[in-house]
Swiss-Prot record:
This protein's record includes keyword Transport: yes
Domain of life (superkingdom): Eukaryota
Reaction catalysed by this enzyme: a ubiquinone + NADH + 5 H(+)(in) = a ubiquinol + NAD(+) + 4 H(+)(out)
Membrane-protein topology: Multi-pass membrane protein
Keywords: Electron transport, Membrane, Mitochondrion, Mitochondrion inner membrane, NAD, Respiratory chain, Translocase, Transmembrane, Transmembrane helix, Transport, Ubiquinone
Molecular function via GO: NADH dehydrogenase (ubiquinone) activity
Name the UniProt record assigns to this protein: NADH-ubiquinone oxidoreductase chain 5
EC number(s) reported in the record: 7.1.1.2
Natural source organism: Allomyces macrogynus
UniProt gene name: ND5
Amino acid sequence: MYLTIITLPLFAFLTVGVIGRKLGVRGSQIITSLSIIISAILSLYGFYEIVLLNNLGPITIYLSPWMNVIGAHADWAFYFDSISITMCVVVSSISSLVHLYSIGYMQGDPHIQRFFSYLSLFTFFMLLLVTGNNYLLMFVGWEGIGVSSYLLINFWFTRIQANKASMQAMLVNRVGDLGFVLGLFGIFWLFGSSDYDTVGIIAYKLDEQYITIVTLFLLIAAIGKSAQLGLHTWLPSAMEGPTPVSALIHAATLVTAGVYLILRSSPLFELAPTSLICVCVIGSLTAIFAATTGLFQNDLKRVIAYSTCSQLGYMVFALGLSQYEVAFFHLFNHAYFKALLFLSAGSIIHALHDEQDMRKMGGLVNILPFTYTMILIGSLSLMALPFLTGYYSKDAILEVAYGQFLVTGTFTYWLGTITATITAFYSSKALILGFFGTPNGSKKIYNTIHEAPLIMSIPLFLLSICSIFIGYITNKHLSVIGIGSSGIISGGVGTLRDHYLGFDIEFISTSFGVQFYPLFASLLGISLALIVLKDPKKMHSIEKPEGLLNTVNITRWLSSKSYWFDNVYNTVLISGSLHFGGIFARDIDKGFLSLLGPQGLQQLLITISRFFAIKIDTGFIPHYASIIIIIPIFIILSIFI
């Protein structure tokens, strides 16, 4: 049964990819959607057996040996524990809803079969990533989701921006993939195996410096795939793909692969304090950076993309604080309300005939009441307002950060609280600009606006239910947050005893403010948005600051330009690399090395040939006769002497 969870998406991809034209549009949609839905049902049953009943324990399914050489061993084997089966539930359930949603969203597209086959391929590789029992098998899934992401972002390949975005996503992630490869080599060198259990057992006997090097390489991989500060530039650009792709890949699954990698590598990171500090700092800086950047975005999907980047920062710095259960709790909750936000945005874009600029919207609350309700639920959950899904996990992260009583804990707590204010501000901004005020779009478009069809509305409704209740259910009835073995994933992570908080997060502090600062921060962000957006034009009038002392304008200007990361990469790294490559090719490759190699050898042979031609080809028969005698004598002497 457990292997069927993985193989069904592969079956759907192969079937539709090979005979999709014969099956037709409807047949391809039925096969892919039904396969993913069955996979989701089986994942839920596996979750019931492994997590709720808790009578099976981790399940390892061994297929065959893969590699068994000196110093390296790996098998084709799959590992189902509380972490992997929960990830299977997230991936398969959201993928099934995205498949259903895409039936309506992609209606009329001439390449529907190709789109659904790509979705199924991505789902297969993501399930392979989270269920493999070793790092090498995880790497196969890691590369597979990268290729699938490229294909889906570039699905509308006739659009230049889609071509650029897919290439950017692929190239930026190459940096992270290099980190994974180096970390994988380090794991094989240190442990002789890439199995999670083997690595976790032997790690405690190795020197800290070796573990630190390996974990830093794995951190680079996580930074690339989870769009953390420095390698984040691909995520907003990836919004050029179809909106269902954004919901599946860039909100709920692919971008969480880096978080999953650190979570699986917790026995290593726990033994490398330097790496944990790096994880903590990078995550907290990513959260505040992405939030401030999202403030001044006009594209609806880009706003949600930057919010994804910011929420991933929360998860990463929670991992850096060794609070793996809380980070995984937020990963689980975030997947559902962020998928709801993206699919709701897709309904708006679908209704407005592909318009994504919020400045050209407005007044949609009476025209699209169902869509407004859905995106409102998702936004409130993102703001972490009480009793919604995001409230339980996001506040838990901030509370455990405060409970560390360390510099890193205080640093992340206050940055996270400030980020909560900004998140509430830009979420409110998106709602106000899109649904309230005077319509700013074309009258022709507004006259044809309609609600999404039923096949698109059902996934939205189901995700809204999850965005309201799933946080409460998992928090109170599944004991996701717990000390020691009380959390449902505690058996899958390795946390040092010194890193346990020693008490539940509900009792971190008796101070009223500590537990309620995040809520006050969110309410402050909503209030500021209502005040500032009375005149929305001022919000978008970003000009270059005249003086360095005008810090407000500087912040607004830098945020609106995404802190110039793309410009720096293009002008310094790319242009500099191309310039250096040109100089190297001209002076070294075609210059010095060419003189030592082909051109120099050619010239030497020509010179020698001319010398002998002049000295030997004299036209005198005695000279030729002497050469005929000398050459055989020379050959005989060279053989026998």
